[in-house]
């Protein structure tokens, strides 16, 4: 196996390795007439072993129609929450997942926890294809995708710089 191309092909697993060493030994040794022929078993090489394929589920990049959406029904309930701590976010998430609009009043929370809760609520609404709107400086409305909110939207856009979201 003096050919470099052949060595490369063997290394990459594209060709089988020739057993030159065994051929050289059989040429120099005298034949034994009384001995039974020995069976030679090939040694498996790493390149000859089939690779193990691991499969994992693929997450689609776009919204698929099989995504679990809240059932579209007549809206007959709106939940109003006055959280005092960040751990109250679980009740907000459970109601929003069921398709219930949630009004969050942050006036009783510390500013740090209120920011965390709004970050959580923003992610929740994005993940479930809903939207979040600021009603007053410390009151927010989480509306699921099947709920349409109408009202005045002019003028509120200009207040974004002075809003609760403004980073100092």
UniProtKB/Swiss-Prot annotation:
Residues 35-52 have a biased composition (Low complexity). It comes from the Bacteria. Keywords: Cell cycle, Cell division, Cytoplasm, Septation. Pfam families: SepF (PF04472). HAMAP family: SepF (MF_01197). The keyword Cell division applies. Cell division protein that is part of the divisome complex and is recruited early to the Z-ring. Probably stimulates Z-ring formation, perhaps through the cross-linking of FtsZ protofilaments. Its function overlaps with FtsA. Belongs to the SepF family. InterPro entries: Cell_div_SepF, Cell_div_SepF/SepF-rel, SepF-like_sf. Homodimer. Interacts with FtsZ. This is Cell division protein SepF. GO terms for cellular component: cytoplasm. GO terms for biological process: division septum assembly; FtsZ-dependent cytokinesis. It comes from Leifsonia xyli subsp. xyli (strain CTCB07). Its main location: cytoplasm. Residues 21-73 are annotated as: Disordered. It is found in: Cytoplasm.
């Amino acid at each position: 196996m003096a050919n470099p191309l052949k060595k490369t092909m063997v290394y990459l697993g594209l060709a089988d390795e020739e057993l030159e060493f065994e051929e050289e030994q059989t040429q120099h040794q005298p034949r034994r007439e009384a001995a039974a022929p020995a069976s030679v078993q090939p040694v498996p090489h790493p390149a000859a072993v089939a690779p193990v394929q691991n499969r994992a589920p693929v997450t689609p990049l776009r919204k698929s129609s099989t995504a679990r959406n809240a059932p579209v029904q007549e809206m007959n309930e709106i939940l109003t929450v006055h959280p005092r701590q960040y751990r109250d976010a679980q009740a907000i998430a459970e109601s929003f997942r069921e398709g219930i609009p949630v009004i969050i009043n942050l006036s009783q929370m510390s500013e740090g926890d209120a920011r965390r809760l709004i970050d959580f609520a923003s992610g929740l609404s994005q993940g479930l294809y809903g939207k979040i709107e600021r009603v007053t400086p410390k009151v927010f409305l989480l509306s699921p995708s099947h709920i349409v909110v109408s009202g005045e939207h002019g003028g509120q856009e200009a207040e974004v710089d002075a809003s609760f979201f403004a980073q100092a």
